Amino acid sequence: MGIDLSEKETRKEIIDPILNRVGWKTGGHYVKEEVNPVKSNFVTKEYVGIEKGIERNVDRFIDYVLLDEDRSPIAIVEAKKTSIDVEKGEIQSRTYREDIEKQLKIKIPIFLTNGHKWYYVDDLDRRRQVALPFNQKDLHRIISLMKKRKDPSNVKINPKIVDRQRGIEAVKLVLEHFSKGHREALVNMATGTGKTRVAIAIIDGLIKAECAQKVLFVVDRISLGNQAKEKGFKKYFPDSPICELNEEGYSDSARFYVSTVQTLMSSQKPRGKFYEKFGTGAFDLIVFDEAHRSYYDRNNDIFKYFDALKIGLTATPSSEDTKDTFELFNCEKGKPTVKYDYWDAVNDKVLVPYVGDIIETKVLSLGIEGKKLSKELQQALKLQEAEPETFQTPGSKFEKL
């Protein structure tokens, strides 16, 4: 049984170090503690707290107010002791936010925490669990978008990006899906029907609607990354900075990012993973091109770490992956947001029927056993946090036509 810390101890021993870790220096210029939301003037940035002689048990106080560079509030943090459910502070924190909203006319984000779990309440009152609180730069961008956000379902789709009717319909479906408040979408389209173009058109629509500014495109093969970068971002957003993430390539100031799962999951010195170079609120939209089924992120750590709209692109998933993929993207009744299969595409004359030759190989028939691989390949497995002695994958994983 763990030690039951008081709220004060929880803040000092757990919450303060987490805030410091993501860039909020408690006791510093941009973090105000024990702020009275009624007596403070958020317009003139005069924050009234306990230090001015007000009794803690008489007036209500915001545990933490996080400030932007101009010292205006951009988020509040409601803390509870470790033994209390995080959600217990939600009603209280919404009251504090209303006090701020009366003065500033905006709904700033709320973070709820007991030190072990963090929840985020956005301006639409949607609560969801997040890995960590967001840093100042990301909160600034999120609030800026929030002030200008429009309904993505009303955005005009760019015909230069998608011109086929089924592609246009796919883009509309996803934009309408996000318009209804969903945060994940799964686009299931047969190979060769234009998934990447559909994804780029969705990105374009969300940017026009001020729902997204920073986008991460995740792939499991370098060739897919090159396709997204060259035929997508460079072609349709020529004036926007693009960053291809790798061991040498890292920036937090680009608009579009392309990365393999392998890069994001690679270990960094002295500790941590590459993706942890970014804050949890670093991206407004993440597109996973088949990468959500990658062996390199079997626990979906990347998916869980970032708080963003998320789109999965996939051809027909294999039967053993289908359930997990649909659950990951919160597909209602086990159906993807968009489905355009091979035979639909053949009937639309987008694809032509194939004639396949079946070629049998040892890999297809026997699969792969890590302990039978060469030392070089076993070492490659270890770099991806797989244990060669126990690693096995069936040959069906590699069946392609």
Walk through the language-model features, giving the residues of each.
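ATP-dependent helicase/translocase motor core
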Residues: 1-76, 80-214, 219, 223, ...
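Short beta-alpha junctions and helix-cap segments that line functional grooves
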Residues: 202, 229-231, 243-246, 271-274, ...
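Substrate-gripping "pore-loop 1 plus following alpha2 helix"
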Residues: 270-284, 293-295, 323-338
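Amphipathic alpha-helical transducer elements in NTP-driven molecular machines
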Residues: 86-94, 258, 285, 293-296, ...
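Conserved nucleotide-binding/hydrolysis micro-motifs of P-loop NTPases
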Residues: 82-84, 116-119, 222-224, 262-266, ...
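SF2 helicase catalytic motif II
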Residues: 276-312
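Conserved motor-coupling elements within RecA-like helicase/translocase cores
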Residues: 245-257, 277
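Interdomain helical connector at the RecA1-RecA2 junction of SF1/SF2 helicase-like NTPases
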Residues: 323-401
